[in-house]
Amino acid sequence: MPRHGFTAWAFTKWNLALATLLAASGCAGGFGSGAIASREPGFRATSVRRPALLVRVSVPGEVDKRERDRIPENYEAAVVEGLERAGILAVDMVSVPGSSARPLEGLDRTAALSRAREAGAEQLVIVDARLSQGVLTHCKQSGRARSGPTTYWDVGLEIRRVADGQPLLVEPPAEDLRAVDVELDCKTNRLIRRKSMDELITDSVGLVLAPFSSR
């Protein structure tokens, strides 16, 4: 994956105030995706071998344009590399522009399935990631919860059978699929460090592609 030295964004007072307002209203860090988690009985993602791939990576407009262009490229490359490490070679890949929609919402699946059929794929794999910044709460399970500004990826995974378009696996955005830039010592409630964007992308892609390596 290309290195580019992008680090966590600095919060301005306006950003922090906005993030706090969003958190208070239940908007920041929420998982309101309309997609419902599901799996066709007996289906395992490890059975996928030569799918078509659809990737959407959404980055906020506040990010510098150069990084806004580069981050999706790096994320897409990480997805392809991750699938290849699992022995999965995509027969076709298309990336669609980012949007303000939640992961797995607002995608043209009909067009993607049509293209997948033309490519001779048996499955369509959709990876839909969105980069955000907001106030999140960490260390909940330790009993020493701490809230603070966080850069994070929310991501959804969907696998469809190309022949009839039926969903085989749907994993909408969820807390256990969220990659965050904050590393905290939950015992002392102290910030250890903030991850680079490269690390954050690697973490996010590893989480969303986990079903392809599960045995």
Predicted regions located by residue number:
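Stable alpha-helical elements in mature extracytoplasmic
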Residues: 71, 75, 79, 108-112, ...
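Alpha-helix termination/capping residues and helix-transition junctions
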Residues: 21, 45, 118-121
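Surface-exposed acidic loop/strand-edge motifs in secreted or periplasmic proteins
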Residues: 89-114
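Surface-exposed short loop/turn segments
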Residues: 106-167
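A structural "domain/chain start" motif
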Residues: 27-98, 208-215
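Solvent-exposed loop/turn segments at secondary-structure junctions
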Residues: 59-61, 130-135, 177
